[in-house]
From Swiss-Prot:
The keyword DNA repair does not apply. GO terms for molecular function: 3'-5'-RNA exonuclease activity; nucleic acid binding. This is Oligoribonuclease. The gene is orn. One of its GO terms (cellular component) is cytoplasm. Residues 8-171 form the Exonuclease domain. Belongs to the oligoribonuclease family.
Length: 181
């Protein structure tokens, strides 16, 4: 594996809620693709330990979702904190992409970036300032070509690695059907 500035870093976080100032990251995963969206490597998938007091603040949706997926229990058992998760993830992405080259890639990625800025600032700073947000295309298709949305199937497990795989597949779908490039 060699660093390539054309590679893309895909990231997804699972959090205890949507408020970057008060909620916490509980899972992080990364995938690196080439510029044509071919997966080159999957990074570590890490459940991040949070104290019970943090987990207790989850709203009903998050409590149900992360409880049913098993993530809440993985978080309780995890010995990995945010700093170690940041270090391990940086170690992975730095093998594939030089600093400040890849946009941060994913779905609704601005939300993840806000959490990274507070909880994992070195990782957030590793990305280019631009975002490759698949949600932008999703919103445009919903408004301008809603019939095209029917061809897209998503599982929506709300597990970080699954969500990244679905984001990459979704962008491929938009490239092939909407952008036709």
């Amino acid at each position: 594996m060699a660093q390539d500035a054309q590679n893309l870093i895909w990231i997804d976080l699972e959090m205890t809620g949507l408020d970057p100032q008060n909620d916490a990251i509980i899972e992080i995963a990364t995938i690196v693709t080439d510029g044509q969206l071919n997966v080159l490597a999957e990074g570590p998938v890490l459940a991040i330990h949070q104290p019970e007091s943090v987990l207790d603040r989850m709203d009903d949706w998050n409590r149900k979702q992360h409880g049913e997926s098993g993530l809440t229990e993985r978080v309780r058992r995890s010995t990995i904190g945010e700093a170690e998760a940041e270090h391990l993830t940086l170690g992975f992405v730095s093998e594939w992409v030089p600093p400040n080259e890849s946009p941060i890639c994913g779905n609704s990625i601005c939300q993840d970036r806000r959490f990274l800025a507070r909880c994992m600032p070195r990782l957030e700073a590793y990305f280019h300032y631009r975002n490759l947000d698949v949600s932008t295309l999703k919103i445009l298709v919903e408004r301008w070509a809603p019939a095209l949305k029917e061809g897209l199937q998503k599982q929506s497990t709300h597990r970080a690695l699954d969500d990244i795989r679905e984001s990459i597949a979704e962008l491929r779908y938009y490239r092939d059907t909407v952008l036709k490039i």
